[in-house]
């Protein structure tokens, strides 16, 4: 199937499985194939720098949306946050071409829509349709690509506000957009984000549900493709696709062909303990 789009889950610095995936006959055999990356290209895995270079090397064949770990790298580059012990982004920050790598990353989108599929890292708020999602993502993209991008990143940390209001401005507006697109998992029935609860899928308390099950979600008529939720794992529904299958935790790196949902998975060695941090 020539000219296919392969949608790929969280790489998180696991370059060896990424190389195996790209070398798989179904992917490597199509010189016109394109690759969608669901964010979190770097961090936690052993080869963040190599992973980033590999994806950049794909040129226009790759579409990569920003994930929370990618934004964390940008914040570290901006001096807004210091890397933690479990981070594996130091080699990127110390690379001789670090400025070029960071510049490439901060010019990535937070949302991409094509052929009825909306690609984001974590999810969308129930009130947002595709047009609204792309417009709000565009606001953050403009800030990250601008001359004051370091200052913009200072505003993104925090869990509030938990729901969308059109009159939000400044830091509040940026936080709710970034949190929805790169951090969301659980919501209330009213669509308010909830970040404190960390339980296995299906064990969430009454009054909470996955963001994609909030009643009346405005994107239910298209397919939202996301990663971010490794404990949820592979999820294939007509309206949502989750592709984070826990590569860095010893799961697999997954690619799904958009046109027919053919699945290719590469088994990964465990690099970090998901319960350790």
UniProtKB/Swiss-Prot annotation:
Q: Does the keyword Hydrolase apply?
A: yes
| Keywords, alphabetical | Hydrolase
- Gene Ontology MF: a single term: bis(5'-nucleosyl)-tetraphosphatase (symmetrical) activity
Broadest EC class assigned to this enzyme: hydrolase
InterPro entries, sorted:
ApaH (IPR004617), Calcineurin-like_PHP_ApaH (IPR004843), Metallo-depent_PP-like (IPR029052)
EC number(s) on record? Answer: 3.6.1.41
Cross-referenced Gene3D superfamilies? 3.60.21.10
Q: Which reaction does it catalyse?
A: P(1),P(4)-bis(5'-adenosyl) tetraphosphate + H2O = 2 ADP + 2 H(+)
**Record-linked SUPFAM superfamilies:** Metallo-dependent phosphatases
A Pfam family reported for this protein in Swiss-Prot or TrEMBL: Metallophos
Q: Which domain of life is it from?
A: Bacteria
Q: Does the keyword Hydrolase apply?
A: yes
Which family does the UniProt entry place this protein in? Answer: Belongs to the Ap4A hydrolase family.
Function of this protein? Hydrolyzes diadenosine 5',5'''-P1,P4-tetraphosphate to yield ADP.
Q: Which HAMAP family match?
A: ApaH
Q: Which NCBIfam families match?
A: apaH, PRK00166.1
Q: In its UniProt entry, what is this protein called?
A: Bis(5'-nucleosyl)-tetraphosphatase, symmetrical
């Amino acid at each position: 199937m020539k000219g296919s789009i392969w949608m790929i889950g969280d790489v998180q610095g696991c370059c060896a499985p990424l190389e195996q995936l790209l070398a798989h006959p179904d992917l490597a055999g199509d010189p016109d194939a394109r690759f969608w990356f669901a964010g979190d290209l770097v961090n936690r895995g052993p080869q963040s720098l190599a992973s980033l270079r590999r994806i950049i090397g794909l040129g226009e064949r790759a579409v990569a949306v920003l994930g929370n770990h990618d934004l964390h790298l940008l914040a570290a580059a901006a001096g807004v946050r210091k890397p933690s012990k479990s981070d594996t982004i130091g080699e990127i920050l110390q690379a001789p071409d670090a400025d070029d790598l960071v510049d490439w990353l901060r010019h990535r989108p937070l949302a991409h829509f094509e052929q009825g599929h909306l690609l984001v890292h974590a999810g969308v708020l129930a009130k947002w349709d595709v047009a609204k999602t792309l417009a709000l993502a565009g606001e953050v993209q403009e800030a990250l690509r601008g001359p004051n991008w370091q200052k913009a990143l200072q505003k993104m940390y925090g869990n509030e506000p938990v729901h969308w209001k059109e009159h939000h401005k400044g830091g509040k507006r940026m936080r709710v957009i970034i949190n929805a697109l790169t951090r969301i998992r659980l919501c209330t029935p009213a669509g308010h984000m909830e970040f404190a609860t960390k339980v296995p899928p299906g064990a969430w308390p009454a009054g909470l549900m996955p963001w994609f099950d909030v009643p009346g979600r405005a994107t239910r008529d298209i397919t939202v493709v996301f990663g971010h939720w490794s404990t949820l794992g592979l999820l294939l529904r007509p309206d949502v696709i989750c592709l984070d299958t826990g590569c860095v935790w010893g799961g697999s790196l997954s690619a799904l062909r958009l046109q027919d949902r053919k699945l290719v998975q590469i088994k990964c060695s465990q690099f970090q303990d998901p319960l350790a941090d």
